[in-house]
Amino acid sequence: MPSTPLSATVEALSEDAAQARHAELSRAIERANQLYYNEDAPELTDAEYDALRQELEAIEARFPALTGTTEASAGVGAKPSEKFAKVRHAVPMLSLGNAFADEDVDEFVARVRRFLNLPAEEAVAFTAEPKIDGLSLSLRYEAGRLVTAATRGDGEVGENVTANALTVDDIPETLSGEGIPEVLEVRGEIYLSHEDFAAINARQEAAGKPLFANPRNAAAGSLRQLDPAITASRPLRFFAYAWGEVSEPFTDTQSAVLERFRGWGLPVNPRTKLCRSAEEMIAHYRAIEAERAGLGYDIDGVVYKVDDLGFQRRLGFVSRAPRWALAHKFAAQEAITELLAIDINVGRTGSLNPLARLKPVTVGGVVVSNATLHNEGYVQGVGADGEPIREGRDIRVGDTVIVVRAGDVIPKVRDVVIEKRPADAVPYVFPDTCPACGSRAVRELNPRTKKLDAIRRCTGGLICPAQGVERLKHFVSRNGLDLEGFGQTYIEVLFEAGLVKQPADLFRLEFEPLKAAIVARREALSAQRRTEGEPAPKKPTKKKGEEEDKAIKNLLASLDARRTIPLNRFLFALGIPQIGESTAKALAKRFPDMPALMAALAAATREQAGRDWLELSALPRIGPGTRDRLFETLDPLPGEAMQDLSLGARLRGRLTPSQREAVLAHYGSEAEADAALERAASQRPGDAYRLFADDGEIGPVATDSLIQFFSEPHNDAAVRALLEEVGTEPLAATTSAAAFAGKTVVFTGSLEKMTRSEAKATAERLGAKVSGSVSAKTDLVVAGPGAGSKLKDAEKHGVKVVSEDDWLAMLAEA
């Protein structure tokens, strides 16, 4: 069965489901950005990351109110690290749109021509240059001298790495030549050659240090060193390809800019070509692809840019990318080798991640000995949608496998050479307990597909050491307990020192052990740097020590200030799957405190619905209402008594023709459908379960997740231990104002005096409902600059429209 197109999947989402999926995608993208840009340790392939981005943008296209409400939606890259001073880019460093097929390039050229409204006889020139797989860097020159070097960061704010950039031979400290603008921001890429990368890893291995996974990670890690001497010891290279702020125009085409750069002493890629058609662009792409292995450095595609800068200005930008540029990505590189073993790593969110141990093989110039196998379903030959992949071929130890490096970053096993499978190879059996903590590992019901998730997860939650640090970071985060001063570093220090293993431990901290852990971490880092031949950090001065003591006391004070917590924040902070902020708030509306909620959940657990009941509820044209009416009585109805029918057949006969069609399509035959209906009849949930599951703001998926979480004894014990240290309080009552209570409000355009999430929260606090679309039921539209189709919809339906200032004035009167 073909997979459902993305557009159809998004079209089927309700507003609440879209908001939940948008939040889920945003979290995944933000984590991927953090790993890629700040930790130089990406987990996703380019294709996997692009798929997340495409789905996020599709949801935002249908629900525009969600645009800009998360970091993933509003920006590119990741927040800059706390290790470096911040630099705000005068002109944001944006990302590029992607092309994966020749047809995408044809469409790009056609789209540019349509936007510019050019006659058929007028040609448009494009530059085509290799896309370097490195770290983006912005160099600010004033009066020809380098004054600041900054990483991309989140696109708006980057990290100040000036001292490190000055050690890179390719980066001139002073530009030379004629016509240099007074202010010139040069954008480019830091990278390592294959030869230099191999030499660095050889030195790492000789020193007993971890090897870098690839040249991109090594280049990024080298540039983002606190000690410039380390950066200077690594032979980093640089290519310039773009610009940010300039004090005055200095040419009128992209190709001329690159020539100027070259003349001023900045290195530019020699394989850049000027093309005048999509055919020429694709031909150059093919030529560079053929040369790729011999270039001596990593590239992952070709970037096309409209050459005429006047055209570039007219084309402008859309979302996070320019309309006038496109990145044409290369297909993955492949090799064949033997699968020696399958190891299981436990991820930071509890996922059991299979890792292939391979007979070493060279893929794209890099020796690969490990590769991802994604998840249990992938190993079994089943996709995320439950449909077969690789024609159903599973992956077994001893198999000959095809390994790919997608995007020149993460190797993965793509397929099995089934003809070479050993006779004694047996299917791999995934563990059903967590190798890190021994808790049950389960596959959850996917709320979108209504099928078992492809990923098996540890249920140990709060006590699993593999998840511990990330769970604790989530617990103290701004949307959790919002513990002031408790950054990621403190959590890592406390966890490694054994002082904090679960949330309750935070509230048992004392001054002396906390200080000792911080001092021990500092001394360990000093010893490590001395071992590596690097200068150790200076010992803190008396004044610095006093400031450190004060900071520790402030941490303890912030903990004491959180010993009474709103129930919704407490629930969200626990990090229970499927319990986001909205669901946590819904639960907090219905229960006064945590003990009351836990008692209700215990009763719900005893009356939980069975699998067939839940599966039936999710079928098209059935739903909870039809299901409940269907099972109101199991006794024969008038007209059924005279027929010698089984219970399942009687129940099937009560369905409408379209409902019967849906049931038969799902179960495959009347016999299977009747058997499932009979099983469902015996699996009906009790009232205690339905109190949660039938609630529109909670639902069966979140209910089952809550039950599963608290059914794990370790989690139940951890929450009870936490409740000995803190108390929960009811959700603050909604403040209703006559102007807003029960009203439906829509925000459109840019809000300049508050974020969209702030505006939404304020409206909801005053008793209003915030919607993503305008209809006849909408009461008020708040329109900022750039408002589009929603204004027309408001006029069509006669809905009142106010400005952001009007809205703020209304709030002041409420």
From Swiss-Prot:
**Matches recorded under CDD domains:** BRCT_DNA_ligase_like, LIGANc
Q: What is its EC number?
A: 6.5.1.2
Question: Quick one: which residues bind Zn(2+)?
Answer: 434, 437, 458, 464
Report the top EC class in one word. Answer: ligase
Q: Which residues form the active site?
A: 131
Supply the alphabetized keyword list: DNA damage, DNA repair, DNA replication, Ligase, Magnesium, Manganese, Metal-binding, NAD, Zinc
Provide the reaction this enzyme catalyses: NAD(+) + (deoxyribonucleotide)n-3'-hydroxyl + 5'-phospho-(deoxyribonucleotide)m = (deoxyribonucleotide)n+m + AMP + beta-nicotinamide D-nucleotide
Top-level taxon in the UniProt lineage: Bacteria
Region of interest (Disordered), residue spans: 526-549
**What GO biological process terms are annotated to this protein in UniProt?**
DNA repair; DNA replication
The GO terms describing molecular function are: DNA ligase (NAD+) activity; metal ion binding
Co-factor(s): Mg(2+); Mn(2+)
Alphabetical list of HAMAP family matching this protein = DNA_ligase_A (MF_01588)
Which family is this protein grouped under?
A: Belongs to the NAD-dependent DNA ligase family. LigA subfamily.
Record's PANTHER family?
Answer: CHROMOSOME TRANSMISSION FIDELITY FACTOR 18, DNA LIGASE
Name by which UniProt lists this protein: DNA ligase
| The species this protein was found in | Methylorubrum extorquens (strain CM4 / NCIMB 13688)
